[in-house]
Amino acid sequence: MTLFQPLKGKSAESVETIEALRVLPEQVGEEVESLSEEQLRFRPGAGQWCIKEVIGHLRDFAEIDHDRLVRMISMESPLLPGYDQEALVRARNYQEADLRAVLAALASFREQTVHVLTELVDANWARQGRHEEVGRFSIRQFVERLVRHEAMHLEHVRALKRQATGF
C-alpha cells in the first residue's frame, strides 16, 4: 500500500486545505510585525490571552497536531490524547517569550505538517484516529478542523490588534 505521493494528482480540496495551513504562519507574522511589545501584551480582560499567548497557543497546537497526524498515518486508529491548552500557555510563559522565536517554531511545525500532507496519498486522508475528547475522525476531518481552528485564531489576533492599537 502506498501512503505517500507528490502533490501532483491531489484533489483540489486537498490542495486548498494544505495551502490554507501553509500560509497561516506568514499571515500571523504580517498581522503583528508592526506592533509594540506593549500592544503584543495587551489583554482585553482578566484571564484573557494577549496576542503573544494566542500565537503561542497556535505554536503548541501546530506541534501537538503534527504529532497526532504522524500517529494517524503510522498507526491504526491511534488514541490521540487531549491537552490542557491554558496550562501549556501558562507553563511556556508566552507573554514573556521572544515572539520571533515563537513564530519561527510555529512556521517550522507547520512546514513539517504541510510536507507530510503534500506527500500523503489522497485515499489515506480517510485514515482515522480517536481523540479522547472529540471522538473518532479521519485525517481529512482532522485537517479541516485544524484549518478552522487556525482561521478563528487569526481573526482573534486581528481583533486583539484592533483593540490594542485602537484601529
Model regions: which residues?
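Extreme N-terminal tail/first-helix region
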Residues: 1-23
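Acidic/His metal-coordination segments adjacent to aromatic residues that form catalytic metal sites
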Residues: 11-13, 51, 88-102, 133-141
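Short, contiguous alpha-helical
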Residues: 2-7, 41-85, 111-114, 128-167
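A structural signal for long alpha-helical coiled-coils and helix-turn connectors
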Residues: 36, 73, 118-121, 161
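General structural signal for secondary-structure boundaries
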Residues: 10-16, 36, 84, 98, ...
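Short gly/ser-rich anion-binding loops that grip negatively charged ligand groups
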Residues: 18, 55, 59, 103
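Cytochrome P450 catalytic-domain "roof"
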Residues: 34-35, 40-41
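Acidic/histidine-rich alpha-helical segments that form the ligand environment
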Residues: 19-33, 89-126, 146
